[in-house]
Every structure is written in structure tokens, then in C-alpha cells.
């Protein structure tokens, strides 16, 4: 089964907790702190595998969670860092943040890797907090929580040339005779319901990939027929072969077909009309095809002024293989002259994550619940909160000093907080002391 979209959740591993421990050995008086740091949590990494052709693996397996780092140990030993969770994806997978819609990465090269969720760093053990004033601290940190996010995956197959046209104009037949692909062929509409891919090799030795897409009909951009759901697979192509049934066997005007399909491509709004098109006049072995072709050329010329270059038209027959060699040579020549079209501006993509905080990032926010409790939130504040070991009094006092240093106390006073008011961070509540 072909699946080209999927929504999944990924959770990187938490960092391991730091340890509070002291050196206790015979003949070693005042051994001092000896608690080690926790290990790093595992990342969730997408790896491109050219052997995959669909996102089917994500249909039933939608949750991916990396292991957490090990806790710090005595004797100053660090916990082991967790292994990264490596998830295989097919070439041509676009990864978006499901919440913001932002493109995180576009994975097109075999072996390409991208970290979609970063593991948390390990918490520090008490050996890290020793100072001349406090040589035996009972302070440690919890591990940093791993990144958690929901992702939208879209597969856009890698092809140099895309075949577009109404249903039953001969796209699948053409693909079957110019490549070794074996698409389903039938004398009814929408025989092709998933994209098919094949490799062409011309007589001159050049090769390129061709994608046969399910047929479009008028109104596809509004969801008629199969809609435009498969047009994402033409986004990576550099040349479009516009297949037209010149026999008019369906009772439609070939030129009206040409206009209708171009309108649907334009409605898709992904600069598809900027790609060079070759008009393929198919079924030239049928009666009246030549007459219809002449009429088509006349109407096409009437809609172009004398200074515009008319699109190239190649009469062929997929059934008798008439004109195929000329068409393929012209397509290969056009491909050589056509650069790749960038789907996304790399400056808009998420950079590899870094650790730390932006200087301009707001450290905390203050709000008030209906029960008059002050509520503190904010990414920086919550990170400090989550890494505080509330089982140790010294760690709690350290967190209080950090809040004071961030200006939380002054901000609460400015908002009208009074001695004894309740303050909540997450599920933790404490009294404000003025």
C-alpha cells in the first residue's frame, strides 16, 4: 500500500539525574563530594534509506521515544549516555512541525540524517557544586527533559519528469513502454490511483526518472475526483510532460483539456507553471487525431502573441511507439538546460538545535488563576524547575536564588503579590515571602 503522508510523535530521551554522594574511605578524612553527572538522553534521528518507497511504516507505529541517559554514580562516575533512536525514512520526505507548520528539513540524499528531537543533557552531580565556601554541597540536578514534538511527514517522490493529464489519456501506457515500470493499465478512469515511478534510458545513453501521476479532472483543486493530493509528487520535477488525447475519444476538445489541466496546476499554487512543459499529443494512431492536432495547434497559436515561444508539441502513439525516441531525446535535452527548483528556502528551515537560551528570550511570565494563585511559566524558568532536585533542601535554596536573580521576586511584588500568597510552577506550589 502506498502512503505519502503521516503524523507522528517523537520524544527524545531525558538526561540522567546527577548524584549526591560523598567519599567515605578509611584514611581519607573529609573525602568531599563524589557524585557524578547524569548521561545525555538519546536523540531521535531521521535517516534516509533509498530502499524505502512509502511512509507505510508510520501508519501503525506513530510514537517514537528514545532512551534516557543513566543516572550519575558515586566515585564521580558519569552515567552512560543513551543511544540515539534512528528512524528510517524514504528519500523525498519533508518534515514539518505539526504545531507551527514550519519545515524542519527536506530529506533527499541517501544516508542523510537530521535530528528531529534532541535529548536532554545530564544533570550535574554534587562534585560540580563544591566551592571554598561550601566544600560539601548536597546539591544535584535532575536531567534535562528531552525534546518532544509532533511531526507531519510528507513524501514527495524524486523524479526528473512528471506526466500529467486527464484520466485515460495514456500516461500509464506511455510509462510502461518507455521504462520497465509495470503500472496498472485499464480502459476506465482512475486506473492509476498512486504515483508510479520508472527510469528512462535514451538511445544516446542519457537517463532520467519519470513519475506517472493519477489523472486530474476539471475541479480537482476543489477536491473533484482524486483532487490534487498527488500533485505533491510533481513538485520535485524539472520538466512536465502534458499528455493530451488527440483522438478525443472521450468526447472532449483536446485544447480545452490542455487549458483545464494547466488551470488545475496553477491552482495548486506551487510554481508548477514555471516548470517547462512539453505537450505530448498521444493516440496519433487513432482516426481524426491528425485533424484534431492541426486544430489544436491553431488554437494554441491564437492564444500566444507573435513574440512568445510556443510550447513544443510531439505527436506520439504509446500503443505503436510512434515518435517516442524523438520525444525522449527532446526531454533529456530540456532537462540538461533546466535547473532544479527549490521547494523551500533554506533560511526558513530550522537550524540544527543548540543548547542555551536566546538573549532576547523572555525568561518568565506571570499570570493569575481564578483561585488568586500566581502562576509562573516560561521556557527558561521551566527548564530550571525541571532540573531542580526538590528532594534536597540545598537544591531548593539554589532554585530560589535563581528565581531571585531572574527578577521573579521583584516582578511578583510589582504585580501586587503579598506575603503568604500562593505561587505555582507546574504542579509545585509555595508561599511568597516578601
From Swiss-Prot:
Residues 356-434 form the OCT domain. Pfam families: DUF1967, GTP1_OBG, MMR_HSR1. SUPFAM superfamilies: Obg GTP-binding protein C-terminal domain, Obg GTP-binding protein N-terminal domain, P-loop containing nucleoside triphosphate hydrolases. Residues 159-336 form the OBG-type G domain. GTP binds at residues 165-172, 190-194, 212-215, 282-285, 317-319. GO terms for cellular component: cytoplasm. The gene is obg. An essential GTPase which binds GTP, GDP and possibly (p)ppGpp with moderate affinity, with high nucleotide exchange rates and a fairly low GTP hydrolysis rate. Plays a role in control of the cell cycle, stress response, ribosome biogenesis and in those bacteria that undergo differentiation, in morphogenesis control. Its main location: cytoplasm. Belongs to the TRAFAC class OBG-HflX-like GTPase superfamily. OBG GTPase family. It is found in: Cytoplasm. Monomer. It comes from Streptococcus pneumoniae serotype 4 (strain ATCC BAA-334 / TIGR4). Residues 1-158 form the Obg domain. The lineage of its organism: Bacteria, Bacillati, Bacillota, Bacilli, Lactobacillales. Keywords: Cytoplasm, GTP-binding, Hydrolase, Magnesium, Metal-binding, Nucleotide-binding. Its cofactor is Mg(2+). PANTHER family: DEVELOPMENTALLY REGULATED GTP-BINDING PROTEIN-RELATED (PTHR11702), MITOCHONDRIAL RIBOSOME-ASSOCIATED GTPASE 2 (PTHR11702:SF31). This is GTPase Obg. One of its GO terms (molecular function) is GTP binding. NCBIfam families: Obg_CgtA, Obg_CgtA_exten, PRK12296.1, PRK12297.1, PRK12299.1, small_GTP. GO terms for biological process: ribosome biogenesis.
